[in-house]
């Protein structure tokens, strides 16, 4: 008899000790509540031991059965990547094992260049490819924001324009073969894009999302979907800030595509790229080979980091 539990996806689960695979992937995370899916497609509500919170959507984990609907997460398997943010007070895991970050932005409501820049740095630090999605591209307010994003195309970040209700399919070739995550401010259209890409899957996953979100109209948890056998997509809650306290100041220049080729070229090995003579970074900014605003951004992030 199929389970009536809202997190089970209506999948029948016989004796768990006889049928359960001991590995699974976290497909939803909400505080200390998780949904995991085993290789045969069965889903379970999951908890952790000792109130551990170091698990993320996308993690592949070892599990132990509790009953036909619930399991305990014992530990995570080695990660390919981990995307997270950290400020002076706390660390927030965003997603594990993703290979591509899509930063969804739009001219309305007010877009945050600060968030965009920081998310790109976090992706570089995690070894994750990054793509910028300019959503709501048909709005008249888009022209100015589009112009600002052209700079990031020169750095090698693709910028893809979408109108979520009309041409979300433009993203399919970009997503194909990747474990993707959509990230951005609230109101940028991440969930609308996700629903458009899911198509017929939307109704099937709606009960789980509604249960996790407690009836809210905005995404409050990370949720992983399979677009096909080779492609996954994580929809994540909206962000306003992206702390980078987990980064090391000495490594920062390597995360800037426009400055990494200058690493090691300054006269002094401990150059702060400010007033030192023979600074390759400062020279590049002064001659127009690099953006003075980007150098100021690098300096500002360096000042934020502890130590």
From Swiss-Prot:
Taxonomic source organism: Neisseria meningitidis serogroup C / serotype 2a (strain ATCC 700532 / DSM 15464 / FAM18)
Transmembrane segments: none
Similarity comment text for this entry: Belongs to the TRAFAC class YlqF/YawG GTPase family. RsgA subfamily.
Binding site for GTP: 135-138, 184-192
UniProt-recorded name of the protein: Small ribosomal subunit biogenesis GTPase RsgA
EC numbers for this chain: 3.6.1.-
Enzymatic class: hydrolase
GO molecular function (one): rRNA binding
Region (Disordered): 1-20
Domain CP-type G: 85-242
Gene responsible for this protein: rsgA
Keywords per UniProt: Cytoplasm, GTP-binding, Hydrolase, Metal-binding, Nucleotide-binding, Ribosome biogenesis, RNA-binding, rRNA-binding, Zinc
Amino acids binding Zn(2+): 266, 271, 273, 279
Location of the protein in the cell: Cytoplasm
Cofactor note: Binds 1 zinc ion per subunit.
Annotated Polar residues bias: 10-20
């Amino acid at each position: 008899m199929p389970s009536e539990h809202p997190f089970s996806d209506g999948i029948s689960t016989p004796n768990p000790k006889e049928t359960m695979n001991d590995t699974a992937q976290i497909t939803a995370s909400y505080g200390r509540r998780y949904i995991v899916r085993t290789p045969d497609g069965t889903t379970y509500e999951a908890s952790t031991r000792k109130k551990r919170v170091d698990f993320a959507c996308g993690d592949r984990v070892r599990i132990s059965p509790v009953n036909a609907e619930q399991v305990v997460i014992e530990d995570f398997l080695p990660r390919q990547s981990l995307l997270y943010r950290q400020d002076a007070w706390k660390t927030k895991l965003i997603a594990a094992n993703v290979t591509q970050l899509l930063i969804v932005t739009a001219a309305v409501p007010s877009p945050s260049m600060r968030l965009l820049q920081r998310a790109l740095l976090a992706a570089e630090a995690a070894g994750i490819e990054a793509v910028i999605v300019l959503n709501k591209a048909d709005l008249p307010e888009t022209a100015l924001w589009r112009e600002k994003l052209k700079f990031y195309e020169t750095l090698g970040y693709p910028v893809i324009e979408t109108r979520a209700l009309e041409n979300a399919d433009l993203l399919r070739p970009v997503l194909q073969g990747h474990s993707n995550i959509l990230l951005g401010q609230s109101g940028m259209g991440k969930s609308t894009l996700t629903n458009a890409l899911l198509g017929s899957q939307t109704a099937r996953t709606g009960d789980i999302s509604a249960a996790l979100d407690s009836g809210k109209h905005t995404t409050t948890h990370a949720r992983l979907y399979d677009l096909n056998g080779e492609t996954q997509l994580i929809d994540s809650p909206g962000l306003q800030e992206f702390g980078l306290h987990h980064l090391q100041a000495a490594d920062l220049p390597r995360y800037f595509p426009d400055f990494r080729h200058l690493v090691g070229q300054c006269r002094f090995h401990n150059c702060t790229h400010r007033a030192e003579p023979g600074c390759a970074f400062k020279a590049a900014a002064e001659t127009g080979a690099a953006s003075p605003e980007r150098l100021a951004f690098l300096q500002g992030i360096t000042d934020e980091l502890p130590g």
